[in-house]
Curated annotation (Swiss-Prot):
UniProt xrefs under CDD domains: cinA
Record-linked NCBIfam families: cinA_nterm, PncC_domain, PRK00549.1
The organism's taxonomic lineage, starting at the top: Bacteria, Pseudomonadati, Gemmatimonadota, Gemmatimonadia, Gemmatimonadales
Gene3D superfamilies: 3.30.70.2860, CinA-like, MoaB/Mog-like domain
PANTHER family: NICOTINAMIDE-NUCLEOTIDE AMIDOHYDROLASE PNCC, NMN AMIDOHYDROLASE-LIKE PROTEIN YFAY
Pfam family, one: MoCF_biosynth
Domain of life: Bacteria
Name of the protein: CinA-like protein
Entries under InterPro entries matching the protein: CinA, CinA-like_C, CinA_C, CinA_KH, Competence-induced_CinA, MoaB/Mog-like_dom_sf, MoaB/Mog_dom
Entry similarity comment: Belongs to the CinA family.
Length: 428
């Protein structure tokens, strides 16, 4: 089944609000085996809404809209779409009664006149109950089987109605043994998109007939495999086989799948090894500590940290010799190592991590340009350091430096099994 999505609202069109509805719909429909072939956004204008929905119906015969079902003058979705089907608008007594009861129960007063508009619906439509808000959804279908579902634009309401009503209805219309859309995401760190493509070779074009998408972000590059044409019973097995082929090529850079978070994975690994951890941060300014402590239960592993931004703090709080900083500079391998060793000894932990770098936009030199970062990891006295040149703005460099530190901890653990690979960011 093919469907098009039309999201409605001036706030979306002008960029004041991020359209999270379309992304959520696409993910949920893909899991159901429904293919989204096009997404469109239009403003709160009746002609634009009618044109966008009419064109979508002509292509697929099935459209989901979000937005424009509220009580104000700019909520034009229902009459605009009713006009496409040649339907008039009528007051639905049951919807009106529900609205009146809702206002009396929740707010203790009668329904405002403006909200009566929400009880106006296209003739011959099916009302879709909305237990998450005031605006009901609408299902409108013609004699040729073409249909439009209108959902509220408020994300919480839209998601609730999708789960309560729309997905069960569509599930009955999707062939039980037909092809489904399934995907598998492998998460990588410390390697660039181009370097991944080079290592994958022909697999970068697709694996066993499945397309492979490269999705770069601050966490690293995600590799997403998608099966479009297999029944549900075969898709997962095919994805597992394809993922195994990718792991053969770039497995040392893969730290997880799906929504796996590297910070959470490292905390779990530390707990399994009965190791505690402390961090010493300069350019990241506490970002690594924040990522770790944002995870429930992190207090069992994370003992503390030091934000050693000034050189004097590096010396006073972490024991980094002032003469070392003078000789090598604050952004150097010896200083990063001393920070990791110093914070581990200060907090009495099994692991110490030190990060020092130049996040920019100022402070770079030809020898140490903006983005230069040194990360050191001390695991029970075994200290290893890596230099990286990270791209991006100040926030991106700081975030990627924290991610690099987590990945170096992962590699420190993996070296026990012989994995001593260094990613693309290494510079010396």
């Amino acid at each position: 089944m093919d469907i098009e999505i039309v999201t409605i609202g001036d706030e979306l069109l002008l960029g004041f609000t991020i359209d999270t509805n379309a992304a959520h719909l696409a993910r949920e429909f893909a899991a159901l085996g429904v293919r989204i072939v096009r997404r469109a956004t239009c403003g709160d204008d009746a002609e634009s809404i009618a044109a966008a929905v009419r064109e979508a119906l002509d292509r697929t015969g099935a459209v989901i809209t979000t937005g424009g079902l509220g009580p104000t003058a700019d909520d034009m979705t229902k009459p605009a779409i009713a006009s496409i089907f040649g339907r008039g608008m009528v007051m639905d007594a049951e919807v009106l009664a529900n609205l009146e009861q809702r206002w009396l129960t929740r707010f203790g007063h009668t329904l405002p006149v403006s909200n009566r508009q929400q009880a106006m619906v296209p003739e011959g439509c099916t009302i879709l109950a909305n237990r998450h808000g005031s605006a009901p959804g609408i299902w409108l279908e013609d004699d040729h089987g073409r249909w439009v579902v209108m959902l509220p634009g408020v994300p919480r309401e839209m998601r609730g109605m999708l789960a309560d009503t729309i997905l069960p209805l569509l599930r009955d219309r999707v062939p039980k043994d037909g092809p489904v859309i399934r995907s598998r995401t492998l998460r990588t760190a410390n390697i660039a998109e181009s370097a991944l493509a080079d290592r994958l070779g022909e697999l970068a074009r697709g694996v066993n007939g499945m397309p492979l998408a490269f999705l770069p972000g601050n966490d690293g590059v995600d590799l997403r495999l998608t099966s479009w044409s297999l029944p549900s019973r075969d898709a997962e097995g095919a994805l597992t086989q394809a993922a195994a082929l990718l792991r053969e090529k770039v497995g040392r850079f893969i730290y997880g799948e799906g929504d796996d978070d590297l910070a959470a994975l490292m905390l779990s690994e530390c707990a399994m090894r009965d190791l505690t951890l402390a961090v010493a941060e300069s350019c990241t300014g506490g970002m690594l500590g924040e990522r770790l402590t944002a995870i429930p239960g992190s207090s069992r592993t994370v003992q503390g940290g030091v934000i050693a931004y000034a050189n004097e703090v590096k010396t006073r709080e972490l024991g980094v010799p002032a003469e070392m900083i003078a000789a090598h500079g604050a952004v150097s391998e010896p200083v990063a190592r001393a920070m990791a060793e110093g914070v581990r000894q200060r907090f009495g932990t099994g692991i110490g991590i030190g990060i020092t770098g130049i996040a920019g936009p100022d402070g770079g030199t030809p020898e140490k340009p903006v983005g230069t970062v040194w990360v050191a990891v001390d695991v029970e006295g075994d200290v290893r350091a890596v230099r990286a040149l990270l791209p991006g703005n100040r926030f991106e460099i700081r975030y990627r430096a924290a991610q690099l530190a987590l990945d170096r901890l992962r590699r420190a653990f993996a070296r026990e099994a012989g994995d001593d690979a260094v990613g693309w960011t290494s510079r010396g």
